[in-house]
Amino acid sequence: RLRRAHPVNERRGHGFISSQKEGSELFAGIDPDAPIIVLLTAWQYSHHLAPSLVHHRGPILLLANFDGTWPGLVGMLCMAGCLTSLERNYSRLWSETFADEAFIRGLDTWLRDGHLSHKLGYLHPVAPSAPLLASEAGQIGVKVGQSILKHKAIVGLFDTFCMGMINGVFPQKAMIDVGMPVESLSQSALLVEMNKVPTDLREACLDWYETRGM
């Protein structure tokens, strides 16, 4: 029997979880072994629920709509990235209509087994001896990679934990190992610098894009 874990907040006019505190209080009242479906129909701040999901013992299904009007799938990818970085297992399922055979089959599998996996057979590592790397494009890629390792390609990252993106806290060693160290930047500082740009230069830059079809 499906039971909603939290009510719509009549004062706010929605049922979204609005803080880590609210998410923590919600999960404190949920059976820790109960199967949980996290329905995602829009972008959400994953850190409102992720810490509680890590401690939840029951199976977790991230369920999203597949509709560009309402970016639930994007929200699910963020939550999935957060849970992966926190080493918490979960299952994923999405649909455009929630009536298609693939969705029904996937939901039945999760309800029966408590987990759902998707086919990944199309993924495979590219070995150094692969024909792809011997091609012209492959050789260009090798040279670019060698250049990045030698000279570095510094990645500017605005407000690492912005919008609750735990998955935005990139592991430094992984980034440095591929020659792409992170420079942490502030959106507040960006706003200050933007205000220093004269209006005529702003308009000239905008015109540059518009004359090229943007």
Residue ranges, per PLM feature:
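An N-terminal assembly and electron-transfer interface module characteristic of large anaerobic redox
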Residues: 1-214
